[in-house]
From Swiss-Prot:
The lineage of its organism: Eukaryota, Viridiplantae, Streptophyta, Embryophyta, Tracheophyta. ATP binds at residues 207-211, 215, 346-347, 351, 432, 447, 538. Keywords: ATP-binding, Ligase, Magnesium, Nucleotide-binding. (E)-4-coumaroyl-AMP binds at residues 256, 324, 346-347, 351, 449, 453. This is 4-coumarate--CoA ligase-like 4. It comes from Oryza sativa subsp. japonica (Rice). Pfam families: AMP-binding, AMP-binding_C. Both substrate-binding domains (SBD1 and SBD2) are involved in the substrate recognition, and are sufficient to confer the substrate specificity.
Length: 552
């Protein structure tokens, strides 16, 4: 009798030669067998010893778990009734900075089977109007300050994420209530609930569009439930008597913030301290005032902490969790030297994978410099040669494909993009060039679509960026493909110089040329005051490409 593929999985790397796939070295997390479970019911049913769910960092207001779930039930009852009449399949938009109201609005809408979409408050009215036209929400949660950014569609109802109404609110017919009003509603026990299953859409989040137009990503209740279980396992939060306190510095409109702070952590009894926006002094005050133990952040915040002349006071902080973009060796070492008492952990994920894919879950795992970590629980991966389509073994670079219960359902109203990204048997083509080493650690080399094609060679921008960041007079950098008739494309660098530096284009090009193969040389340089990045810290190369080519 032949050996099954299951028996042929290499325990060290997770690679199965028979199927040419990698399997996570982490134990699978249990998922509910009942198909008729929505993420809100799942979260509310978790048992834990936590008391305080949310804290407003600015005011100190505390919301207990009892108050949170009462508010969610009340808000859901109010939203299901006239005049909003929110139903399963309707889309609800949240346009808001971080606040303790954000999770209440999100959970109330999803509990009804509505699909949640979010927008960046920094977006222009035109950008928001484009998303509204695509998603067609029937309800928007927003603040008084952001209300003018919403298109004046007559059929769009608005719930203000404010504590009380003001006299001027009555002049806008779109406003039906405040979040405090609907949260105080007595839940109607006779209300008929729509049947919501794990396969139903839960969120419609628009991808960052770092390389092209933004697309709506549809995730299901199963996706979010998987994420909740993986988060609780990663931080060993379930069944613990100790309450951890997380500081929310990342935007809840982004997949990272939404799945962690507005959903995942609320299922395990952790306390979430909410910053309305990131400012270093306010972050430090909150860390010390509220006894924060975990600090999830994006790389630019980490850079600021390392760049500070003296170590910052971090109180009871034990772990920093970085996501959104990979961390370089120099940054990790600089942080460890300045804050030896704090572990630094990393994560890798996409909007399309509900922010899940790989992570380092201990200081020891993070010491493998450059890694995104081990594959997440319940995850399979392939490394696929972009040219031949062949699945590759250990230590070979190709496009990362992943499969797991958290993978998106597809792109909203975009069958072509869905078919090119999701295979019929559930593999998500990430668009990232990666390899998995002999111990099962994932390394992200670059974005497949961002490779610079110089003659017949492929040049990863991230490699040149990492090199340029080692220059003592460079504080930030982005490398893009610059079109050229003879060679196709060549590397162009946008550089942010250190204050007082007179670094020249020639010096930059010589610095790189001494350390790389000829085809990787930087052949054009521009100096800028900052590098455009999205909310998760990823470089917006498309903006820089547009800037560079607009002068041609």
């Amino acid at each position: 009798m032949g050996r099954s593929p299951e028996m042929e999985v290499d325990a060290r790397s997770g690679y199965c030669a028979a199927t040419r796939t990698f399997r996570s070295r982490r134990a699978d997390v249990p998922l509910p067998a009942d198909p008729e479970v929505d993420v809100v019911s799942f979260l509310a049913s978790r048992r834990h010893s936590g008391v305080v769910a949310l804290v407003d960092a600015a005011t100190g207001r505390r919301i207990t778990f009892t108050e949170l779930w009462r508010a969610v039930a009340g808000a859901a009852s109010a939203l299901a009734a006239h005049p909003v009449s929110l139903r399963k399949g309707h889309v609800a938009l949240i346009l808001s900075p971080n606040s303790v109201h954000f999770p209440v609005a999100a959970l109330a809408a999803m509990s009804l089977g509505a699909v949640l979409t979010t927008a960046n408050p920094l977006n222009t009215p035109a950008e928001i109007a484009k998303q509204v036209a695509d998603a067609r929400p029937v309800l928007a949660f927003t603040t008084r300050e952001l209300l003018p950014k919403l298109p004046r569609a007559h059929d769009l109802r608005v719930v203000l994420l404010e504590s009380a109404r003001l006299p001027g609110d009555s002049s806008d017919p779109r406003i039906v209530a405040t979040i405090e009003e609907i949260s105080a509603t007595t839940p109607d026990p006779a209300r008929r609930k729509d049947r919501v299953t794990q396969d139903d859409p839960a969120t419609l989040l628009y991808s960052s569009g770092t390389t092209g137009p933004s697309k709506g990503v549809v995730a299901t209740h199963r996706s979010l439930i998987s994420m909740v279980q993986i988060i609780m396992t990663r931080f060993r939060l379930e069944g613990s008597d100790k309450t951890e306190t997380f500081l929310c510095t990342v935007p809840m409109f982004h997949v990272y913030g939404l799945v962690a702070f507005a959903t995942g952590l609320l299922g395990c009894g952790a306390t979430v301290v909410v910053l309305s926006k990131y400012e270093l002094p306010e972050m430090l005050r909150s860390i010390n005032a509220y006894g924060v133990t975990y600090l999830p952040l994006v790389p630019p915040i980490l850079v600021a902490m390392v760049a500070h002349p003296k170590p910052l006071p971090l109180g009871q902080m034990r772990k920093v969790l970085s996501g959104g973009a990979p961390l370089g060796k120099e940054l990790i070492e600089g942080f460890r030297e300045k804050y030896p008492q704090v572990e630094i952990l990393q994560g890798y994920g996409l909007t399309e994978s509900t922010a899940i894919g790989a992570s380092t879950d201990s200081a020891e795992e993070s010491r493998r410099y450059g890694t995104a970590g081990l594959l997440s629980p319940n995850t399979e991966a392939k490394i696929v040669d972009p040219d031949s389509g062949e699945a590759l073994p250990v230590n070979r670079t190709g496009e990362l494909w992943i499969r797991g219960p958290y993978v998106m359902k597809g792109y909203f109203k975009n069958a072509e993009a869905t078919q090119s990204t999701l295979t019929p048997d559930g593999w998500l083509k990430t668009g990232d060039l990666c390899y998995i080493d002999e111990d099962g650690y994932l390394f992200v080399v670059d974005r497949l679509k961002e490779l610079i094609k110089y003659k017949g060679y492929q040049v990863p921008p991230a490699e040149l960026e990492a090199l340029l960041l080692t220059h003592p007079e460079v504080t930030d950098v982005a490398v893009i493909p610059f079109p050229d008739r003879e060679v196709g494309q060549f590397p162009m660098a946008y550089i942010v110089r250190k204050k007082g530096s007179n670094l020249s284009e020639r010096e930059v090009m010589e610095f790189v040329a001494k350390q790389v193969a000829p085809y990787k040389k930087v052949r054009k340089v521009a100096f800028v005051t900052d590098i455009p990045k999205n909310a998760s810290g990823k470089i917006l190369r498309k903006d820089l490409i547009k800037l560079a080519t607009s002068k041609l």
